Each structure stands twice: as C-alpha cells, then as structure tokens.
Amino acid sequence: MQIPLLTPQKDPMGAAIADYFANGKASKLRVFSSMFDEDEIPVKQLFRNFTEMPALEQEALRMSEGRILDVGAGSGCHSLALQEMGKTVKAIDISPLSVEVMLKRGVKDACLENFFNEQFSGSFDTILMLMNGSGIVGKIANLPIFFHTLKRLLAPGGCVWMDSSDLRYLFEDEDGNLDIDIDDDYYGEVDFRMQYKNIRGNRFDWLYLDFQTLSLHAANNGFKAEKIREGEHFDYLAKISRI
C-alpha cells in the first residue's frame, strides 16, 4: 500500500495538533465525506490523558506488553500513557508535525513512518491501533496486505489490539434489517477529507470494520480475532494474534 508521508501543506490534523500544543487551543478541524454531513474533530480530544480515554482504549493500554508499536500515534496520548505505566513504546505517524509534537511532549521514541512501508522493520510484542485502528487499511481489498504486515512486524506470541466500529446501524431499516445493495462496496468503506484553517488535506479512504468481517479475513490470513470488549457506540476492541 502506498500511503505517502504528509507535507505540512497537506496535513490539517498535524497543523491542528501543533497549534493546540503551542497555544492550548485550536480552530475547527473540519471533516468532509461524500457519505456524511460535515463534521469536526475536537482537537482537545487528541490530547486526552488516560483517565479521559474511553474504556476500550484504557483496556488496550493496560493489556499492552513487551515492545509496543503505537500506529498512527498522532499527538502521542497513548504512547505517553504507556510510558507513565513504565512500558516501552515506539510511536509512528505519517505526519511530521505530529511527530515533532510527540517528541516535544516527551515521547521517547517517535518517528515519521508509514506502517505499510516494507522497509520499516522491527519485532513487536504488541501492535496498538486505536481510534478506529482499522481505518488505515482503507479498503476491504487491502486486508491481505494488512495481515502480511502484521506477520512481518509481530514477534512470536505477539498480538494486535485494535478498535473499530460497525456502521450497520446507519443502514438498518425500522425492522433492524440491513438496507444495502449487495453489489455496492462494503458499507464500512468511507472517504474523508480534512481541513484546518486554509490547510486542506487530500481525500483518503478509511475502513470501519464489523467484527464478523474482521474475524473472517483474519482466519483467511492465518490469524484469529477475539472480541474483548464492546463500547457504547457500536464499537469494539479486538485482539488479533497468529493461529
């Protein structure tokens, strides 16, 4: 998968993170999609501490052990919480502005890196993918590449902690039946574009994955997925490990 590293001119989230870190406040981080109305991400939420995190995230951090890889680490909130627990973590992100903020905030090992880059190497006991961690896969068709990457980076006996959401509630009729065309793309495949002030990012694909589909594709690629906990908004935390 070719996911390019971002430049500051095309990195609205990184700019918002840098602004909030420098000034203690930020403007609207706007989110656009062809499927939904315009929305916004509260930038303060990207700087939450452990006690402010949802229960699913707290559980994943508590269960993380050994050498940990924090994928798409953003402002570094999860990595910092792990460090406070005395755990060893490497944080990666494709945003240079975010990586700069992480280092300034005290993340000991943060680097600019694409998770899917074949040149990125390491052996990790835990791979942490939170805040809809399945999102970076982009499309169902990319799941084999995702599992190939896990095989390359997971240490023997290692596991992935990943959260995601089932969007079926958006497509259910009054009787609870799924009202979708089976010839359409998978209903969890979404496109987004972000904007912060005058900085507009490129459109990107984002994957929301129901647990049954995750479990099926995991099994087809030599892994097993276990649903560890359910959230309050059709979200869940999964543990993924080699069979």
Language-model features: locations:
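Class I SAM-dependent methyltransferase "Motif I" SAM/SAH-binding loop
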Residues: 72-76
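Conserved alpha-helix/loop element of class I SAM-dependent methyltransferases that forms part
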Residues: 47-67
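A short SAM/SAH-binding and catalytic strip from SAM-dependent methyltransferases
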Residues: 124-144
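A short glycine-rich, Lys/Arg-flanked "PGG" loop and its adjoining helix->strand segment in the class I
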Residues: 143-156
